[in-house]
Amino acid sequence: MNTVCHKQLSFGSLFGKHVTADFDGGHITSDAGGLLLRELDGRYGITEGAARCLDDPRHRSWVIHDLKTLIKQRIFSIALGYEDTNDATTLRSDPALKTMTERLPESSLDLASQPTLCRFENRVSKKALRRLADWLFEVYVKTHPGPRDVIVIDIDATDDPTHGQQQLSFFHGYYEEHMYHPLFIFDGISGFPMACILRPGNTHASHRSKAVLKRLMKRLKKAYPEAEIVLRADAGFAVPRLYSLCEQEGIHYVIGLITNDRLKEKSAELLAKAKEQFEQSGEKQRLFTSFNYQADSWSRYRRVIAKTEYMDKGANQRFVVTNIALKPQRLYDEIYVLRGETENRIKELKLEIKADRLSCHRFLANQFRLYLHTFAYCLLWLLRENLQGTELANAQVGTLRVKLLKIGARIRESSRRVWIHLASGYPYQALFSLALQNVKAAPT
């Protein structure tokens, strides 16, 4: 029998008593709150559905870690803040993570190692990625039951810096870096992701947007035939093919325009009026107007909203093109400006979920990683939805992780039960209990 000697650690003294620590406290985890994610996943089947999208060419008799376990391990790890496969080296025996992935914390085998997870990510095929795209939309429909009056689609692109010789990594002049150029589509009201597409680094912001939106609109109409659909986007998506698509599909849109001399000329009178009012009052002026406009690349005239501000620093003008018949200021302030929330969702994905940690050499493997990070975000989104009416109803996912998932606990296994002894000093016990109660009561 092997005997393990644990070295005692000394931390000085306190009121004449020696402060001593050692590492023989038992199977203790710092992520016991992750069991909330296990409950959510059990109700919505996010990881199980994602596993069904994948192909497994391995011989069954040689498989130790099946696809369902591998994808649970990756998605739950990302949600807990362990985005790198390298983290599996130290976390594969963590009792909470093992429990979350349907393994017994003590008697079951440890989870997959970093090399196994790396092979898992690099095996993905184009067909599997298409199925994952479909599954992400199905999860959206499951979490947004109808009927619905209005659906707002927000589309935006972001940069993902690359390193070394990664496939389809290119220099982008606007961002001035070698990068990938992911495309994200969110529900503009709830903030739930509908699509995430990884693209080469040298693509335009609107690249592939028409094809993705056309398919998405078709599926939205089928799922919510009663709903009015509105598309919002910034000037990176100011391309005629998107206007035409929306008009053909009966979709409302409001899309930013890049300011040019012709637009300035059309709004010159409004600018002069704003300047005059500012000089008279000394207070910031904010005026709106609308007019018909046709760029050289457009097949027809379209309605353009002009916003003109005048202040101490001078003029600030913005233009949007739309087919919505609302008063200019109401359309701009109540519809278009709210598009900015999508940028906050992308920030959450990048800063809290580390969705820009796409470090594989293979491009398809990085697209797969983007889906894994997005599904992890979906779980945390669902957790936040089950906290409506509490202090965490509008919390960032990083705050949810710190307050509800990072809980110290001792986990032990008996012949009949798995016992999870949460830290007595955990300060959010009532909130955690309420979250679990809401999750268990949530409709599926």
Residue map of PLM features:
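An anionic, glycine-rich sequence signature occurring as long contiguous blocks
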Residues: 4-22, 252-354, 437-444
